[in-house]
């Protein structure tokens, strides 16, 4: 069916060109969006015509109803849909015949005319001129819910955007949230910066990196797992309030909350500590939720999340004692391992850091409203400053919402000797088979030796945050083009079914 459909459309294109009509012209002067037309002329009464008001509009044809010498058709742009009406008496018999033969669902068309409301009260453009702007060679899906395979949606996101208006709004909300974040930080004197994506040494998080090869130097390099260490180098160099929004890459699993390629923001402020960063995190996310959702109490997958400040703050040690009855500072590894086994958790790597991480995962699931888990042990926080009251702990927090880690922040470690020792401990863990442990970064230690002021640092996983504000069940729903298992083009073509009937 698809092959025959394309062949027919190609014949139509040849016919248009033989008539001197270019089916892919260069430009069209679009004056108003669908939303602007509705806002400007919605006051019209049913049957009222405003012939003195000329306007132009362009968009994709989504439906057509032919009635003899007239036709109604719906057009769509990125603000919504608008109806148009065309008749032979207005555009001429030749242009009307051309419209009937060659303007199809999926095509882009530009129209000029005036607004009126139909007898049923629908705001409509009365078409006096039209221009074919782009011919579609493929049929649109017959109905959106007819695409059963979500993998097709993720591979061909443009299809979802074409036929599902909610998808457009979902991604608009995501992009608006990014704008809100920038406005919030810029208004507070932060500078947006850029740091490398190709790294000589990975760092800033515990994760397995993607490896690539730089031919000119004949060396392996890594896609960044986090920008943290380069951002702190900028603090060493003299910047005081900086942030970076960008992509990170971790060569790990895919799940409803994990993507190998994801977007984060990292924020660093000299002369601040983790208490300041907690306040900043709360204020920033409250602003994002308020401006994108209009309320601080939102529905997510049938449950309410209340972002109203102040948010709860809980010490990790106390939390795990209360929920699991273990003391992550005093109990030996055997006790922690036994507790995990009681909960059916299996571990490949059984060092203390992994034991504590898995225990934490067990109890965080129950936290729905935003909650700061604070004061993590040193063994799981190689880049955080030791706690001022207990050197076994660090001044670190994680923000948990709906059982998911959304943010991670520290009073940054700025003691080069302590940092070097932590790297040595991480290197030992790597030698024992922990591929996610930090690599030794001697240049970063060297940078710290020049002196870094007291600094608060914060990282937020933006995709997970955007899942909440768009009520999306999986992270792939908020990433425009997520990573999916590839299929051969021919296999994808075979999966395509149907099209609008014309």
Swiss-Prot record:
<keyword id="KW-0067">ATP-binding</keyword>
<comment type="subunit">
    <text>Homodimer.</text>
</comment>
<dbReference type="InterPro" id="IPR004365">
    <property type="entry name" value="NA-bd_OB_tRNA"/>
</dbReference>
<dbReference type="InterPro" id="IPR044136">
    <property type="entry name" value="Lys-tRNA-ligase_II_N"/>
</dbReference>
<dbReference type="InterPro" id="IPR018149">
    <property type="entry name" value="Lys-tRNA-synth_II_C"/>
</dbReference>
<keyword id="KW-0963">Cytoplasm</keyword>
<dbReference type="InterPro" id="IPR004364">
    <property type="entry name" value="Aa-tRNA-synt_II"/>
</dbReference>
<comment type="similarity">
    <text>Belongs to the class-II aminoacyl-tRNA synthetase family.</text>
</comment>
<keyword id="KW-0648">Protein biosynthesis</keyword>
<feature type="binding site">
    <location>
        <position position="405"/>
    </location>
    <ligand>
        <name>Mg(2+) 2</name>
    </ligand>
</feature>
<dbReference type="GO" id="GO:0006430">
    <property type="term" value="P:lysyl-tRNA aminoacylation"/>
</dbReference>
<dbReference type="Pfam" id="PF00152">
    <property type="entry name" value="tRNA-synt_2"/>
</dbReference>
<feature type="binding site">
    <location>
        <position position="398"/>
    </location>
    <ligand>
        <name>Mg(2+) 1</name>
    </ligand>
</feature>
<keyword id="KW-0547">Nucleotide-binding</keyword>
<dbReference type="InterPro" id="IPR034762">
    <property type="entry name" value="Lys-tRNA-ligase_II_bac/euk"/>
</dbReference>
<feature type="binding site">
    <location>
        <position position="405"/>
    </location>
    <ligand>
        <name>Mg(2+) 1</name>
    </ligand>
</feature>
<dbReference type="InterPro" id="IPR002313">
    <property type="entry name" value="Lys-tRNA-ligase_II"/>
</dbReference>
<dbReference type="InterPro" id="IPR045864">
    <property type="entry name" value="aa-tRNA-synth_II/BPL/LPL"/>
</dbReference>
<keyword id="KW-0030">Aminoacyl-tRNA synthetase</keyword>
<keyword id="KW-0460">Magnesium</keyword>
<dbReference type="GO" id="GO:0005829">
    <property type="term" value="C:cytosol"/>
</dbReference>
<dbReference type="GO" id="GO:0000287">
    <property type="term" value="F:magnesium ion binding"/>
</dbReference>
<dbReference type="InterPro" id="IPR006195">
    <property type="entry name" value="aa-tRNA-synth_II"/>
</dbReference>
<dbReference type="Pfam" id="PF01336">
    <property type="entry name" value="tRNA_anti-codon"/>
</dbReference>
<protein>
    <recommendedName>
        <fullName>Lysine--tRNA ligase</fullName>
        <ecNumber>6.1.1.6</ecNumber>
    </recommendedName>
</protein>
<dbReference type="GO" id="GO:0004824">
    <property type="term" value="F:lysine-tRNA ligase activity"/>
</dbReference>
<dbReference type="InterPro" id="IPR012340">
    <property type="entry name" value="NA-bd_OB-fold"/>
</dbReference>
<keyword id="KW-0479">Metal-binding</keyword>
<dbReference type="GO" id="GO:0005524">
    <property type="term" value="F:ATP binding"/>
</dbReference>
<dbReference type="GO" id="GO:0005737">
    <property type="term" value="C:cytoplasm"/>
</dbReference>
<keyword id="KW-0436">Ligase</keyword>
<dbReference type="GO" id="GO:0000049">
    <property type="term" value="F:tRNA binding"/>
</dbReference>
């Amino acid at each position: 069916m698809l092959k025959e459909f394309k062949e027919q459309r190609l014949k139509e294109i040849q016919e248009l060109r033989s008539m001197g009509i270019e089916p892919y012209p260069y430009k069209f002067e679009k004056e108003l969006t669908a939303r602007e037309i509705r806002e400007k002329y919605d006051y019209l009464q049913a049957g009222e015509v405003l012939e003195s008001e000329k306007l132009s509009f362009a968009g994709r044809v989504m439906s057509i109803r032919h009635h003899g010498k007239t036709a109604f058709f719906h057009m769509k742009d990125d603000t919504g849909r608008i109806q148009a009406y065309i008749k032979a008496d207005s555009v001429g018999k030749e242009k009307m015949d051309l419209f009937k033969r060659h303007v199809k669902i999926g095509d882009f068309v530009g129209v000029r005319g005036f607004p009126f409301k139909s007898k049923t009260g629908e705001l409509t453009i009365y078409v006096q001129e039209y221009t074919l702007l782009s011919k579609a060679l493929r049929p649109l899906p017959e109905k959106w819910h007819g695409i059963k395979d979500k993998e097709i949606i993720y591979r061909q996101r443009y299809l979802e955007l074409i036929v599902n208006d909610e998808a457009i709004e979902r991604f608009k909300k995501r992009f608006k949230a990014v704008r809100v974040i920038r406005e919030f930080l810029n208004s507070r004197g932060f500078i947006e910066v850029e740091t490398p994506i190709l790294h000589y040494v990975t760092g800033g998080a515990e994760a397995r990196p993607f490896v690539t090869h730089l031919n000119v130097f004949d060396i392996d390099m890594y896609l960044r797992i986090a920008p943290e260490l380069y951002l702190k180098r900028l603090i060493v160099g003299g910047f005081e309030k900086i942030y970076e929004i960008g992509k990170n890459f971790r060569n790990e699993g895919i799940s409803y909350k994990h993507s190998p390629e994801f977007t984060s923001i990292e924020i660093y402020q000299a002369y601040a500590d983790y208490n300041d960063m907690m306040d900043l995190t709360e204020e920033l996310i409250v602003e994002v939720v308020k401006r994108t959702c209009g309320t601080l109490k939102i529905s997510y997958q049938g449950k309410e999340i209340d972002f109203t400040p102040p948010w709860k703050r809980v010490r990790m040690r106390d939390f795990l004692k209360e929920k699991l009855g273990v003391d992550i500072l005093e109990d030996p590894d055997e006790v922690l391992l036994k507790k995990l086994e009681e909960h059916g958790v299996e571990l490949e790597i059984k060092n203390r850091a992994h034991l504590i991480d898995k225990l934490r995962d067990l109890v965080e699931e129950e936290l729905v409203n935003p909650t700061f888990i604070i004061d993590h042990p040193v063994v799981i926080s190689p880049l955080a400053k030791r706690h001022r009251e207990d050197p076994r702990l660090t001044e670190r927090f994680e923000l948990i919402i709906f059982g998911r880690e959304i943010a991670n922040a520290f009073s940054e470690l700025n003691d080069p000797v302590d940092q070097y020792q932590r790297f040595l401990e991480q290197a030992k863990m790597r030698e024992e088979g922990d591929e996610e442990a930090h690599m030794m970064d001697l240049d970063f230690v060297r940078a710290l030796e020049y002196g870094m002021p007291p600094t608060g640092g914060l990282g937020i996983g933006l995709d997970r945050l955007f899942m909440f504000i768009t009520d999306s069940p999986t992270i792939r729903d908020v990433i425009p083009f997520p990573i999916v298992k590839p299929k051969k083009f021919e296999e994808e073509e075979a999966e395509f079914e149907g099209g609008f009937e014309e």
